[in-house]
Structures are given as structure tokens and as C-alpha cells.
A protein has these predicted regions:
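Catalytic loop of short-chain dehydrogenase/reductase
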Residues: 88-92, 101-107, 111, 137-153
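Conserved glycine-rich Rossmann-like NAD(P)H-binding loop of the short-chain dehydrogenase/reductase
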Residues: 27-41
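Active-site loop of short-chain dehydrogenase/reductase
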Residues: 3, 77-79, 130-143
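A glycine-rich helix->loop->beta "capping" turn
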Residues: 70-84, 104
Length: 153
């Protein structure tokens, strides 16, 4: 098993915390970001093991394929662990978040494109490499907002 983990949405928050933990455990870390370039590059510089930041919109299959090729170029092999953690910019403040009567389908579709389509794009981009190595781990991170919603009342 190679010790390379790809964490989508890992420039800040939970993703950055996981990147730090994997680095401390001796893993190389491929940090994926979309908007938070400074945070991603700062994180990459602070990790003790080899790491690198890769910009990619995971909802775009072409960008995912390019990122995976770039990861192989930088590290010499594909990741053996994939953590799907990317989410769209989300407002956790119930008072500032759109309500059901004002949110548009396009906004919902954007969330689905990043969380579901993005995960599928990454899985499909890595699954053949994982099969050929007879090893791979895929972890999908969700949200507990359906169980503990942030509501403005």
C-alpha cells in the first residue's frame, strides 16, 4: 500500500484537520481546494510529510481527471485512500441561510453537484488504480444537518 491520501475540500475545517492527522501518521497528503488557495498552500507548507495543494472543481469530471494526473506526476503514484469531503460554501447560521421558500433549485443542484457528483467523479477516477493494486479505501463525509438542522427559530 502506498501511503498517499487525497482529501477533497481539505484547505480548511474538517478537511484540514484530517490532512494534519494523516500527515502526522506518516502519510503523504494531496490537498484539494477550489476557492481557498491561500489556506491550502499554507496548510501544505505546515505539514511535516510530503504534501501538495491541487486546485480542482470536483464537480467537473475533466478537472478531476487533470488533478489525478497531476497528483501522479507529483507523488509518482495514485492515492490509495480517498476522502470525499468537499462541500459548496455553506452558511451554518440559520438566520443567514435561505429558507425553503426562497432557495432555488439551482442552489440545491450546486450542492448536489459538489457533494454527490464530485464524489462520484473522484471515485470513478481512482477505482481502476485501486483495483489494479488490490487495495484502496474510500471514505465519504456527509453532514449532520439533516439530523441537527440549523434553523432560525
Amino acid at each position: 500500500m502506498n501511503k498517499l491520501v487525497l482529501i477533497s475540500g481539505s484547505s480548511r475545517g474538517l478537511g484540514a484537520a484530517m490532512a494534519k492527522s494523516f500527515s502526522e501518521a506518516g502519510y503523504k497528503v494531496a490537498i484539494n481546494y477550489f476557492n481557498s488557495e491561500k489556506e491550502a498552500k499554507d496548510l501544505s507548507e505546515t505539514l511535516s510529510n510530503q504534501s501538495h495543494a491541487f486546485k480542482c472543481d470536483v464537480s467537473n469530471k475533466n478537472e478531476v481527471d487533470i488533478m489525478l494526473e497531476n497528483i501522479k506526476e507529483v507523488f509518482g503514484h495514485h492515492p490509495s485512500i480517498l476522502i470525499n469531503n468537499a462541500m459548496t460554501s455553506y452558511v451554518f447560521n440559520g438566520d443567514d441561510r435561505k429558507n425553503a421558500d426562497s432557495i432555488s433549485w439551482d442552489e440545491i443542484q450546486n450542492h448536489l453537484n459538489v457533494t454527490l457528483k464530485g464524489s462520484l467523479n473522484l471515485i470513478q477516477g481512482l477505482i481502476s488504480d485501486m483495483k489494479s493494486e488490490s487495495f484502496g479505501r474510500i471514505i465519504n463525509i456527509g453532514t449532520n444537518l439533516v439530523q441537527n438542522p440549523v434553523v432560525p427559530y
